[in-house]
Amino acid sequence: MDIVRLGIIGIGNIGTAHAHAVYGGEISGMKLKAVCDVNPKRLEYAKAAFDGVKRFSSADELIKSGTCDAVIVSVPHRLHSQISQAALKAGLHVLCEKPEDVSVGRADALNRVARESGKVFAIMLNQRTNPLFKKLKQLVSSGKLGRIKNSVWIVTNWYRTQHYYDSGDWRATWSGEGGGVLLNQAVHNLDIWQWICGMPSSVTAFCDRARYHNIEVEDAATIFARYPDGATGTFITSTGECPGTNRFEVSGEYGKAVIEDGRLKLWLLDCSERKICFESERDFYEAKPSVYEYLPDEKESAHKGVIQAFSDAILKGTPPVAWGEEGINELMISNAAYLSQWKNNTTVNLPIDADEFERMLDKMAQSSESARESAKPAEKAEKQISHVGYQSRWSVNW
């Protein structure tokens, strides 16, 4: 295979941006051959925007058409696993938008199909391409900070207005989106958190429903995590603070690292703090760490970087930015946070009981208010296709 024939299932905001990137020749080794959407207005837009690209009104039609070698799945969250599984079973490579689905049970089912398929299965965790996160990952993995003691991430610059939530009936509903800020916006941060600091063994969470907006899911959340080695972590996020903050601090035995305002700052001791604690003959110790500052010399390749790596994985056998199977990790954390909230903020051990979560999520979805008459369908469709490129809010913002 010299060229990957790509189909995009779902051409709303992000799907349209992907389509323009591939159609415009920005991804080497890949050509846009088909798009699919259930909304006729989006297909009309595609007819005008993507000359020669086939259009389908259902995912099943596109998957069975024989026009594609691979697909990008960019549909509402609850359909991610179902459509991705169908594509993999049909012999197509799959790049799934985040999150992998709304629950670890559904993600696990998709992962099993992916392993059996022998096809490339990747997930759109585009913030892993950010050079600051890549550098911090390298520092922690190499042991530069020593054993991690604590991590704190305040990421409250995901501000959204009520107009945003009213732009689609599926948004911010249990039956449509399957969750709030933890599942939609902060999914990227939860992934980076576990990618760098590892998976916690337990979490206790406070997920505030409709704290800042007229919605039925959480728009603010605080997670307290404990790790197998005794380390702790705190994760705070919301879509209701303006201006917000994005500050990620990781503290270890040899110092600490902080990412904030588009730069990484590193404080390193000349020996382990544990050595200082037990060998010093003084009551107090004035630390004089070496201080380093890292400013990235490369740009975040973001979504295009993920799609390019997906193309290369198919054609060259190189790894994608994130294997699809890794998507279950951040879901494990967000699902545990929801369980903690639903069970009176009790501590939840990981891995969670997937069946229990599915039952409780279904109960929430059954009482969902997803049929809100907050925006006219025609207006929503027009909003979905009013731009052609990637929006800055989809990348790391400081």
For each predicted feature, which ranges?
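Glycine-centered short loops/turns at secondary-structure junctions
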Residues: 91, 118, 143, 230, ...
